[in-house]
């Protein structure tokens, strides 16, 4: 069988094109099922691509990781049949066979690395020596699987290919240069590349930006999809496809080429002819340096960050945006809180999934008119990748340098027929995406600082801390906690400081309880808040003024207990009572913060 490493020393390697969009599967039937139900049809497709001039074919097993993760009965038989059909076809021409693995879901219950390893080992047992991990939006668990392959098959050739949008980011918000760099630095991946999502022209531009010493692969779609009478078709002529990729090969930029969605044997035949017509050129010297995210500089810090990073205790205060289009009263309230001594105004993003004025737009207006630092909350609930990126670029242009990345409260079940959740990200992936936008040659000249949520009242706080560590690893700088209203919350805050370290900035949540009804509601209906019984009982029979006084007293005590383990306080305004929060800030400065 063909030795891939030796071939790449002499000429480019040409893969086949798409199987899924070329093979005519019945509606609703997985293309991979045809390995068992229509082996002759699958074999015929392999033979067409080989006749077109392909040096290598992929097994018809793209969806196997997803099927394996779902414990779909018979996925092993699909792998075996797919392998045997590809080997049979390749044996007729001496072509190489690559075991093809598409993306695996990555969950706590079934990690992606575990799935990739299981599927790869299945192929290794069948005799596979070449492996293609393709159309990936993330590298989660990937290197674990590659390491397992190399341990079992030391001479295995592993090609890893990511699905990258024309702007350089995957659908999970990971930047192509960062992904390529990690593959390069792993020392166990043999080639890296891009496939799917983008058309030839866009992928050519992306490929020219990648650095590193590994062989580079490109397998674009034939073009961009269009829907014609409910059918998805890809526009893009084989001649154009071949010319664009041929230019990359001629420049020595890429060494491995092929096609993805919408490509046919005609595209591969045109590319074969283009490659064969190229003069022999020396391989282009690879650029070993990758663009990395710039470290934060003083120039990119606002007044809040300078104070926080200097070790001073800060005060952040949350004020919910209006439910209507009038911002007059809100700006007046924000100005009063600023005068009282707030360092930062935080603005929730449609809490409890009820529409309010956009938190990011309000943050920009407050920052522009008052000069007060703002922290808009950004949920994963309502925006896809494009909308999120557009909003982040606008925030940066307006001088807003911090954002709180959270998953967001789900939309109530009764409303889901009319209003849909998005949740393209988790808060951890959103943080990584925001951080990746900054750096040389990227969309932001400097980074945004990303904070996350830390639930001190979580029932299984060890799991909460593990997630907090993952958030830090994904680029978050610190956390705003849920309200501290119990001794256990203080203890968990102390544990957080010990576990997460001094570099993780923690703002302890303080929310004044103002009545017994308010306390009972918070305890029973607001996720993430725990109010101890003694607090609820203390409010019995109190009027509004008395309730506020007691709420202030309890908040001061909680702040005193929390501050030894926190970098500042995160105050939450109940019922938009700005006057109450002015008093709280004043007393905190007078009675608590003076000790620091």
Put a short name on every predicted segment.
Residues 1-596:
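Domain-level signal for soluble alpha/beta catalytic cores
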């Amino acid at each position: 069988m063909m030795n891939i490493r030796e071939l790449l020393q002499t000429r480019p390697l040409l893969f086949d094109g798409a199987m899924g969009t070329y093979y005519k599967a019945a509606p609703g039937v997985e293309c991979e099922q045809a390995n068992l139900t229509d082996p002759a049809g699958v074999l015929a497709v392999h033979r067409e691509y080989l006749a077109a001039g392909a040096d290598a074919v992929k097994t018809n097993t793209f969806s196997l990781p997803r099927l394996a993760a779902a414990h779909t009965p018979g996925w092993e038989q699909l792998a075996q049949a797919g392998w045997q059909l590809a080997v049979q076809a390749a044996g007729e021409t001496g072509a190489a066979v690559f075991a093809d693995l598409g993306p695996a879901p990555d969950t706590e219950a079934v990690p992606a690395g575990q799935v990739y390893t299981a599927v790869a080992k299945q192929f290794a047992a069948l005799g596979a020596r070449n492996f293609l991990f393709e159309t990936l939006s993330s590298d989660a668990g990937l290197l674990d699987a590659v390491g397992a392959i190399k341990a079992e098959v030391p001479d295995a050739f592993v090609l890893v290919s990511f699905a990258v949008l024309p702007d350089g980011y995957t659908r999970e918000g990971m930047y192509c240069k960062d992904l390529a760099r990690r593959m390069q630095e792993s020392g166990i991946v043999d080639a890296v590349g891009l496939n799917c999502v983008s058309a030839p022209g866009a992928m050519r531009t992306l490929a020219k930006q990648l650095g590193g010493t590994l062989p580079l692969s490109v397998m674009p779609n034939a073009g961009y999809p269009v829907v014609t009478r409910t059918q998805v078709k890809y526009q893009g002529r084989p001649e154009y496809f071949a010319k664009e990729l041929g230019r990359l090969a001629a420049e020595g930029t890429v060494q491995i080429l092929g096609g993805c969605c919408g490509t046919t044997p005609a595209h591969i035949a045109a590319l074969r002819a283009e490659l064969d017509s190229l003069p022999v050129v020396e391989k282009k010297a690879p650029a070993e340096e990758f663009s990395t995210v710039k470290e934060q500089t003083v120039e990119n810090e606002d007044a809040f960050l300078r104070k926080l990073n200097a070790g001073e205790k800060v005060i952040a205060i949350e004020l919910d945006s209006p439910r209507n289009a009038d911002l007059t009263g809100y700006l007046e309230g924000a100005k009063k809180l600023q005068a009282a001594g707030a360092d930062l105004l935080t603005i929730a993003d449609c809490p409890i999934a009820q529409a309010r004025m956009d938190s990011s737009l309000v943050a920009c207006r407050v920052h522009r008119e008052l000069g007060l630092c703002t922290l808009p909350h950004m949920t994963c609930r309502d925006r896809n990748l494009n909308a999120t990126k557009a909003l982040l670029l606008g925030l940066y242009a307006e001088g807003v340098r911090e954002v709180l990345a959270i998953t967001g409260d789900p939309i109530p079940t009764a409303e889901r027929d009319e209003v849909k959740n998005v949740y393209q990200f988790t808060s951890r992936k959103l943080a990584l995406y925001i951080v990746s936008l900054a750096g040389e040659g990227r969309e932001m000249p400097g980074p945004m600082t990303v904070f996350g949520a830390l639930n001190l009242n979580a029932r299984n706080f060890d799991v909460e801390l593990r997630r907090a560590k993952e958030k830090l690893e994904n680029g978050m700088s610190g956390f705003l906690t849920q309200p501290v209203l119990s001794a256990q919350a203080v203890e968990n805050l102390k544990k957080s400081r010990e576990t997460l370290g001094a570099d993780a900035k923690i703002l302890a949540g303080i929310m004044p309880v103002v009545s017994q009804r308010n306390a009972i509601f918070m305890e029973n209906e607001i996720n993430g808040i725990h109010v101890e019984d003694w607090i609820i009982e203390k409010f019995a029979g109190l009027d509004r003024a008395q309730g506020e006084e007691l709420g202030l007293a309890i908040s001061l005590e909680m702040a005193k207990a929390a501050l030894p383990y926190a970098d500042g306080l995160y105050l939450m305004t109940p019922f938009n009572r700005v006057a109450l929060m002015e008093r709280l800030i004043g007393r905190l400065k007078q009675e608590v913060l003076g000790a620091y």
